[in-house]
């Protein structure tokens, strides 16, 4: 509350046509709460990318459902899909409970739940048992589950292919086996998706995706994309896929638009993309 950095963040969100709501937390002086920030080197050529997160005293750790009107959001406004990130669920015990309560409220009101596992090793250290229980409950309530091979193995204990493996195009079937295991473990979900990323160099990746929708499989074979900054590609995929679902397109287009949105995000130095229109995204797919 009253922080110029908070004001900057609010203005930045507004510039992207994103609304927010939540309690304004008193900073508590110079040594109180603050906003986390990332120090990121995108890399170039032979220099690989590196990221450092500074989260000491992060105000986001205080998220609490008491500060959000869940009845209004789910009961009156009729949210169609609520998206949860494993990064937030693992940030602190408070945010883990926050995500659980959001999932429970969404399930109660018949709102679809999307859950991107987003494993972060530093968040899980010495908290594996606690977080595994939280992630299992959220995943059990979810309609859409997203994660790469490492996420499914470390967050949910679903055996899969080697993380960061090579020759992904030749190992599509091993990813399908992993997704089938996830389908058996979490039968409520009807959409499972994973991205495929093979690093050729800092500025060139092989990028693909696999999605199971009911009994149907949709695969985008890995193909080379130019990369300015890899950060945000996975989130771009999820955002594009959810957008396509909300638009009511055929399932085949969900994964195509998601793939293209992720590819678009890697052409920006920011960790998100702001496409001018749908055509700009589709032009990347085509």
Segments and roles (model prediction):
Residues 1-86, 281-286:
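Conserved N-terminal subdomain of the carbohydrate kinase-like
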Residues 14, 100, 104-108, 139, ...:
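Anion (oxyanion) recognition and catalysis
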Residues 107-112, 186-190:
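A short helix->loop->beta-strand "cap" motif at the edges of active sites that frequently abuts
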Residues 20, 113-115, 146:
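Hydrophobic beta-strand scaffold residues
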Residues 68, 96-101, 127-136:
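Charged helix-capping and loop-helix junction motifs
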Residues 202, 218-286:
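Conserved post-catalytic alpha-helical subdomain immediately downstream of the catalytic base
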Residues 56, 87, 118-122, 150, ...:
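Active-site beta-loop-alpha junctions enriched in small/polar residues
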Residues 123-215:
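Conserved phosphate/ATP/ADP-binding segment of small-molecule kinases
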